[in-house]
C-alpha cells in the first residue's frame, strides 16, 4: 500500500529529473480518473521548493476519495474503504495553486461538486466519466485554463 508521503516523494523525483533535463522552471500537473485522485495528496507532500514550481493543477473526473493502491475490482465497484484518503482536505492543502476541476454531469460522485468557486474553476460537461467522448472539448478547457497567468 502506498502512502501519500511515498507518492509525493516519487513525484518529487520525477519533477527534479525534468527540471534538470528540460531546463524548465514550473509545472502544470494534470490527472484523469485515478490520476486525478492521486494528484492532490502527492502535491501536498512535495517539498516546499517543488510545491512552488506547481503553476496549475487540472483534475479530470476525480472521485471524492482515493486509495493509493489500484485493484482491478475497483473498476467493477467503487466502495469507499476505511483507508481511503478524503480528497477535499488534500485539495485545500495545495491551495492557492490554481485548480481546474472537470466532471461529467452524470457522475454520481465527484470531488468537483464539493469544491467552491473560490477553491477551483469547476466545469461540468455532458456525460459521465468519459465526458461523452468529447475529448476535444476537454482539451480546449485545459488549454484555456493553462493560458491563464
Predicted region positions:
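Alpha/beta-hydrolase active-site loop
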Residues: 2-22, 41
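The feature captures the conserved acid-bearing segment of alpha/beta-hydrolase catalytic domains
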Residues: 62-119
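A conserved short beta-strand
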Residues: 50-65
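A structural signal for isolated positions on well-ordered beta-strands in alpha/beta enzyme cores
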Residues: 28, 56-58, 100
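Gly/Ala-rich beta-loop-alpha elbow adjacent to hydrolase catalytic centers
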Residues: 30-39
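C-terminal catalytic histidine-bearing segment of alpha/beta-hydrolase fold enzymes
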Residues: 114-115, 119-149
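Second-shell loop/turn segments in exported
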Residues: 1-5, 28, 128-131
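Hydrolases whose catalytic domains are alpha/beta-hydrolase-1, hotdog thioesterase
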Residues: 38-42, 68
Amino acid at each position: 500500500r502506498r502512502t501519500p508521503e511515498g507518492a509525493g516523494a516519487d513525484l518529487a523525483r520525477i519533477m527534479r529529473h525534468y527540471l534538470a533535463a528540460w531546463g524548465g522552471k514550473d509545472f502544470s500537473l494534470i490527472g484523469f480518473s485515478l490520476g486525478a485522485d492521486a494528484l492532490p495528496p502527492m502535491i501536498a507532500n512535495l517539498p516546499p521548493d517543488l510545491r512552488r514550481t506547481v503553476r496549475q493543477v487540472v483534475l479530470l473526473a476525480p472521485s471524492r476519495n482515493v486509495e493509493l493502491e489500484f485493484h482491478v475490482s475497483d473498476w467493477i465497484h467503487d466502495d469507499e474503504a476505511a483507508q481511503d484518503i478524503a480528497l477535499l482536505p488534500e485539495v485545500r492543502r495545495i491551495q492557492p495553486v490554481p485548480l481546474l476541476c472537470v466532471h461529467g454531469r452524470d457522475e454520481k460522485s465527484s470531488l468537483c461538486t464539493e469544491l467552491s468557486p473560490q477553491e477551483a474553476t469547476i466545469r461540468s460537461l455532458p456525460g459521465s466519466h468519459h465526458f461523452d467522448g468529447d475529448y476535444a472539448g476537454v482539451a480546449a478547457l485545459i488549454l484555456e485554463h493553462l493560458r491563464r497567468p
